[in-house]
Amino acid sequence: MVDNITIGIVTFKERLELLKQMINQLMSLIGIDNVDLIIVVNGNNEEEMPNDYRREILTIANNHDNIYPIICPEFKSLAKLWNTITIFSKTDYNIILTDDLFIGNEFSLNIILDYINSTGSQFFTINNQFSHFVVTKSILHELGYFDERFIAFGEEDGDMVHRHIEKFGERMPDLHITNFYNMARYDLSSSKVETHTDNKPRFNREFANIKYKQDPNGVYGMSPTPITRVLDDYQQYPYEEFFMKNKDNIKNFKKVIMV
């Protein structure tokens, strides 16, 4: 039975007030005193990390139990930050959330845990969006981590859906939770990013066009037309499975488990 889970949030300086509101929602509505909250603070592209903002993040963490901040001094891809949350958490199951999320359902955490324990699903979206999804360390290593060649943000979710369909024959399942949704605050974004639509970086779109080609016999994922992957993926964190298999041997050594 799964009863331990980590919540991970990616944020940046323009979203500070949203982050504060979200933490208050998590604390008051869900009650996460026994749940680790990993906050990954991203730098803005080609900007210095403001020290006053960094200090405020540390103050937020200091004022609450079980909050673990990871602060990036420069901009990193959303794919890398999602991977980082999953790798750095101490639980197999992880809830990944955006910082512009509204949570008005006090039973959200129980609903998620009940769904996990009744279905055994290791990778699923909530309300059909990657603004909020659940993933395990195990499935991410098996399927392959989010592709960090998408060096900005956007397209990494559609890429993962495509790879899930390729490997398992279907896209990941979805869990519906009422009063739980992304507010889509695209107005609060970094300025030094060339975009193509909805403030999504052009670079990731162009890389997606290299990685996939239109194909009438291809896969329908998040793309409006069927596509086929033409650029190979590779295991970005090859030794994570080795660590997961052997970490109990650090305190009381039995044997090295090779994978």
Say what each PLM segment does:
Residues K137-G154, R163-P173:
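Aromatic-glycine-rich donor-binding/catalytic loop that engages nucleotide-sugar donors
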Residues C72-S89:
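Glycine-rich, basic loop-to-helix element that forms the pyrophosphate-binding segment
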